[in-house]
Curated annotation (Swiss-Prot):
InterPro entries, per the entry: Fmt, Formyl_trans_C, Formyl_trans_C_sf, Formyl_transf_N, Formyl_transf_N_sf, Formyl_transferase-like_C_sf, GART_AS, Met-tRNA-FMT_C
Native source organism of the sequence: Pseudomonas savastanoi pv. phaseolicola (strain 1448A / Race 6) (Pseudomonas syringae pv. phaseolicola (strain 1448A / Race 6))
Designated name of the protein: Methionyl-tRNA formyltransferase
Family from the record: Belongs to the Fmt family.
EC numbers: 2.1.2.9
Amino acid sequence: MTEPLRIVFAGTPEFAAEHLKALLDSPYQIVAVYTQPDRPAGRGQKLMPSPVKQLALQHEIPVMQPPTLRAPEAQAELAALKPDLMVVVAYGLILPQVVLDIPRLGCINSHASLLPRWRGAAPIQRAVQAGDAESGVTVMQMEAGLDTGPMLLKAVTPITAQDTGGTLHDRLAELGPPAVLQAIAGLADGSLVGEVQDDSLANYAHKLNKDEARLDWTRPADELERLIRAFNPWPICHSTLNEETLKVLAADLAEGQGVPGTVLSASKDGLIVACGQNALRLTRLQLPGGKPLNFADLFNSRREKFAIGTVLGQ
C-alpha cells in the first residue's frame, strides 16, 4: 500500500479555510499549515488568528507563521517536513524559487479567477467591477512570477447581474476545493499536464483601495452600479449627505438626468441620484451610527434628509 501524499497547506482567509477543510477530509496527510502571523482586529485591536489557523488548531495540525519565507531558517523548517506537495490558497506571502523547489511535486495554487485574466490580489471584486460575464477558479502549478504558472484545471461560474463581491466569493470558495482535489490526483498519477498561460491576455487585479470606494457621481451609472456590487461587503461604497458619510450597499439603474450627485426623486422604491450618464436608484443605505437599511425604511423615518435637489458628495 502506498503512503498518502504528505501535503503542506499555506493560506490565510476564509476562502483558504474552505480549501483546507476539503483537504482534511481527503486521504492525504496534512503535515503542517502555514498562515500569516496573527493580526490586530476589531475595536479592541486584539490579536486574532486567521481562519486557517483556527481550523488547523481544531484538527491539531502544526501551524507555522513565519513573517517571511525568504529566511534560510524558515526554508529549512519547511524542507524538514519532507512534503510531497504544497497547496497555496490566498496565503499572502511570496514563495521564492527555493521554496517552490522543496516539495517533490512542487507547489500548486487555487486562484479565484479564470487566468490569465485577473492575476493579482483582488480578482473577485475586479471581475464584478469590470462587468465580466463569468469567473471561476484556476488551479495552477506555481512559479516565481505572480499567478503566471501553468494552468492545471479551471472551474467556471457565470457572474449574474445580482452578484456582489461577497456572493461571488462564496461561490468560488465552493468551486475551488474540489478542483484542487482533482488537480492533486492528476499530479500524483502523472495524468495532468499544465497549460502555459498566454501572457498577452493577462491583466492585473490591483488590491482594493478604500479611496476607490468613494462614489464619483460624474461617472456613468452602470459603472457605479457594478462598483457598488463589487465592493460589497468590503470596503463598501460611500458618499456624503449633508457632510455625513452615507454608505451605499445596493443600487440599480434608473432613468433620469441632472447635475451629477443630485437627488432627482425619493420614494419607497429608492433614492434616485443623477450620474454622469443616466441615474442610479439607491435601495440599501447606512447612515452614521446606524445599521444597513432598505431605503423604504429610511424613507419612512428620515424623509427630510432626502429632499429633491439635495446633492450627494459635497
